Amino acid sequence: MTRILAWHFLPEDRRLRYDDGREVKAGESLSVDVTPVLCERGMHASPRIIDALSFRTGPVLCRVRVSGDVVRGGDKVAGRTRECLWMVDAAPALRMFAVDCRARQIATYRRRGVRIDPRADAAIAAAYGYLAGTVTLAEVRAAADATHAAAAA
């Protein structure tokens, strides 16, 4: 039997979508009695975590094992059964990843000679500060507003 180790995101309530509603629990398996078809039916997941981000329905990250008539696609798999090995609220990590991505994007533009308004750096610094607990949400919003104003000018 094919068993694929993969990643899957859940909403905060940790329940399946699409009128199923079953709660996902670490250490337990959930199954469906259908022939898996990618993007249509079955228990889906992504072998690479970066791909799982594209299908994210919420902040709860699960390490899963998919089995049972497994169908493979480029960025996902589907099977009859998905076993949740463990789960974690990944919201803080997802926020940090988003800020890191934006900071890397700005650095890439600078290396290519694009002039970046300093208010963009202030917004990134404010976002990092917010994640560290040293900056308020109001301060982050003010920095973001300044960046948007600079872009519009």
Locations of regions flagged by a protein language model:
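Short, glycine-biased loop/turn motifs at secondary-structure junctions and
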Residues: M1-A153
